[in-house]
Swiss-Prot record:
Source species of the chain: Plasmodium falciparum (isolate 3D7)
GO cellular component: cytoplasm; cytoskeleton
Lineage: Eukaryota, Sar, Alveolata, Apicomplexa, Aconoidasida
GO biological-process terms attached to the record: intracellular signal transduction
Keyword Cytoplasm: yes
Note: Tamoxifen used to treat breast cancer blocks the interaction between DCX/apicortin and, alpha-tubulin 1 and beta-tubulin resulting in microtubule destabilization.
Entry protein name: Doublecortin domain-containing protein
Start and end residues of each stretch annotated as Partial p25alpha domain: 82-112
InterPro entries: Doublecortin_dom, Doublecortin_dom_sf, Mss4-like_sf
Pfam families registered for this protein in UniProt: DCX
Superkingdom, taxonomy of origin: Eukaryota
Chain's role: Involved in the stabilization of microtubules. Probably by controlling microtubules stabilization, plays a role in invasion, microneme secretion and parasite growth in host erythrocytes.
Doublecortin domain mapped to chain residues: 151-232
Subunit annotation: Interacts with alpha-tubulin 1 and beta-tubulin; the interaction stabilizes microtubule assembly.
Amino acid sequence: MENFDEVIKEYQKYLEGKEKTHKINSCKHPCCEEDNLKSVKNYFKVYHKKYIPSIIQKKKKERNEHAPPLLKDIQDKRCTNVFERLNDKQFYTGVQKTKFMELLKNNKNKSSYCYNNIKVFSTMLKKPCNYVVTPGTLGIQKYGIQTGRPKTIFLFNNEKKYDKGVYFLVKSYIKNIKSLCYEITKILQPSIGPTRKIYDQNFSLVRNVNDLINGGKYLCTSGDPPAPIRNLSLHFLT
């Protein structure tokens, strides 16, 4: 009888185990439904152009239930561009939000806030410069004109009918007629001899460098008197 009782107990255990497996396979408990897995599936969703995901818990703590949710409008906010998000006032809170609102009121450029609000101190401002004398005249007032503008004259060779003249600058180092004739000889290069006498258009002899006229025409000879008028250049006579 003892063996029979043991067999019955083992058979009852077998039936109980079979019923449990059948219940598990055919269980329709709400814990096994897919609706309860939505909160978990939120972690695996891919949001298109959403910068703040909607997986943030909507339930706040009891002490913050009376306050309006700050991210209520942001969760479903879609921004096509980074600059739209940066220029959206809903993303700013606290001190940054007040600064942003001041920008909108003053119609300032949103991208150059730091440049429009630079404090200018008195040490940064340049003081106006008061000139004692007009610029460029101080050296003349102290030392005078060091080098005057050189005179320009036109030189003609004697007995050259078709001579058009040579442009010549009477520089400051030429102090007398001798040095003037020496410089003229290097330019004209006469075939007869070096230049020794200089005549003006009135055929008067030039004896001093200061007698030269700016823009005047002069005839250079090697010590001979001026040639007849028919042998002189028309450019010199006119």
